[in-house]
């Protein structure tokens, strides 16, 4: 059974920082690109960041709205992907999901700024 479990959300003041984590199981994590996406009533579903494989030198890509503020990383030995979020803004509020190229999804973690 494939599982993705996010954690680390909560309430943070504007300008603050927060780190999200996602632990995967049930598939070969190191073989999958990983993404963070978020959902809010105002913007709907919005892609946030992507990290590719070791063979791609863990190349990363970001939405323009978070570039320079958010950092995605992964630890294949722990089947985990992370999202470090700095200089948070009210518009970053939403439910954050990790996903494997949109095939598998976690349950999400709520971030409120």
Swiss-Prot record:
Every Ig-like domain range: 1-113
InterPro entries: Ig-like_dom (IPR007110), Ig-like_dom_sf (IPR036179), Ig-like_fold (IPR013783), Ig_sub (IPR003599), Ig_V-set (IPR013106), IgHV (IPR050199)
Keyword Membrane: no
One Gene Ontology term of the molecular function aspect: antigen binding
Keywords attached to this entry: Adaptive immunity, Disulfide bond, Immunity, Immunoglobulin
Pfam families attached to this UniProt entry: V-set (PF07686)
Disulphide bonds in the chain: 22-98
Protein biosynthesis among keywords: no
CC terms in the record's Gene Ontology section: extracellular region; immunoglobulin complex
GO biological process: immunoglobulin mediated immune response
Further facts: This chain was isolated from a myeloma protein that binds inulin.
Protein's UniProt name: Ig heavy chain V-III region T957
Organism name: Mus musculus (Mouse)
């Amino acid at each position: 059974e494939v599982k993705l479990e996010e954690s680390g959300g909560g309430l943070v003041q504007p300008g603050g920082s927060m780190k999200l984590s996602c632990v995967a199981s049930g598939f070969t994590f190191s073989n999958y690109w990983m993404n963070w996406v978020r959902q809010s009533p105002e913007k709907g579903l919005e892609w946030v960041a992507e990290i590719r494989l070791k063979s791609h030198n863990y190349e990363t890509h970001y939405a323009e709205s978070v570039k320079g503020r958010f950092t995605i990383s992964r630890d294949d030995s722990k089947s985990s992907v992370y999202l470090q979020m700095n200089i948070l803004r009210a518009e970053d509020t939403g439910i954050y999901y990790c996903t494997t190229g949109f095939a598998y999804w976690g349950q999400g973690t709520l971030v409120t700024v």
